[in-house]
From Swiss-Prot:
NCBIfam families xref list: rnpA
Protein name, per record: Ribonuclease P protein component
Origin species: Clostridioides difficile (strain 630) (Peptoclostridium difficile)
Top-level enzyme category: hydrolase
GO cellular component: ribonuclease P complex
SUPFAM superfamilies: Ribosomal protein S5 domain 2-like
Amino acid sequence: MDFNRTKGLKKDSDFRKVYKHGKSFANKYLVIYILKNKSDYSRVGISVSKKVGKAITRNRVRRLIKEAYRLNIDEKIKPGYDIVFIARVSSKDATFKDIDKSIKNLVKRTDISI
């Protein structure tokens, strides 16, 4: 998930740290957890549970989230945050437009926008 200013959040321990100590915001399709880190870049992780559907569906939702983030958010957030997006079950029927709108809404509600 290497975008211009973002790296991937990969380790389970990193995800757990963000869940435990981070702030969360939610809407119909997604939940976002945000935690300030001590680096000069942001890290993003995406979690899609098996409750969402089979592998094809989960991967589709993951791709939609990645693309919406890449197109709209990557350049517009302050560096130095760990961000985790969690897809809700309702996201399996969502279109790209729905996910895109959802991500924009969540980021606007947080204080990570430039």
